Amino acid sequence: MKINRVKSLNGEITIPGDKSISHRSIMFGSIADGITEVHGFLNGADCISSMNCFRQMGIDIDYDGCVVTVHGKGLHGLSKPEGTLDVGNSGTTTRLISGILAAQPFASRLIGDASICKRPMKRIMTPLSMMGADITSELGNDCAPLLINGKELHGIYYNSPVASAQVKSCVLLAGLYADGETSVTEPYVSRNHTELMLESFGGNIKAEGTTATVKPVDNLVGQKILVPGDISSAAYFLVAGLITPNSCITIKNVGINPTRDGILEVIKAMGGDMEYSNVVSGCGEPTADITVRTSSLKGCVIEGSIIPKLIDEIPAIAVLACFADGETIIRDAQELKVKESNRIDVMVNALSSMGADITATDDGMIIRGGKPLHGAVIDSHLDHRIAMSFAIAGLNANGDTEITGAECVNISYPGFYDDLGGLER
């Protein structure tokens, strides 16, 4: 994929549905009684992996390209899958489904692609084992493939060493099947889509500060779910509108859940010209249309409790910081090392190759903005967020930027390049 510099970007776009919410809609719909209708489902490879896993366990799921209909079979209605469950590239599928599988009356095996088989799974194996689960790493390296033999579980009070919605959700889902109460406490609040959706399905869930607590219920009830646009996908267009000359972009129906809006806080701190309109709340998930315009930006410090609210947006933020005056420091983001790629090293090396003044640290990076970027050949490492971030950087670099493995955007945003190309230039 070749990207060339543009003179401006203008127009409106509607981004695909939120990936986190789409995953959860399939999972909760499958273990609920009755029908769950999902409007705005993200038809990306990761979410299709979740869909296929539950189909393998006997759940009928219809998808007409607009609406997903999940024919739930209740908390105890899943069937033993024939063969291995393939999660593809999806860490969310791997970790969340493990919490459900840990309590089923059958054994299962989870496998994924090469990236998944390098990502850390001890962070879910530890709390699930504390609950009485039988979960092991087939190769003994605390990574997938995972072998899970369903057991009777008991509730625990778990202090998670990382602020991770995937870890929290895994434990809470297991807690639906456990004897007694299950609580997860995190160092910072992570995204709360599981808590919101579980409550809407009739679960007994309480969230106070950094602790979420679930008690088992007899059943969950299928719902109609309206999936908002994914703020992680919106991030690339927010950055594009802010750094491209003579630009104004409006992104419609973006989810602005307070546990996910870190990039919006950063844009404000950097002095970006941004405004909201049509702010509404549906199914507990607030949305808005967001408009950004070309802005003079200044560097800032990004650290602490905001990091879980923008961890997936940091590659895009790093590009943004290259066009800000002064220094931007990102700290407490060591989680970037265990994403689809080591996003600290990949971003620093690739932006450096484009002429950016950027340095890696143990837990983040330091970007000294203001140096003009030039085109380069960028290896996406088959990481969708890397590919999309450098597409935006390439629009504002001198010369051609070539992204290898650019098709990996299909993981979360299959129409990304079409939407980007559809903006007026």
Question: Which residues are covered by each model-predicted region?
Answer:
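Structural preference for solvent-exposed beta-strand-turn elements
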Residues: 1-425
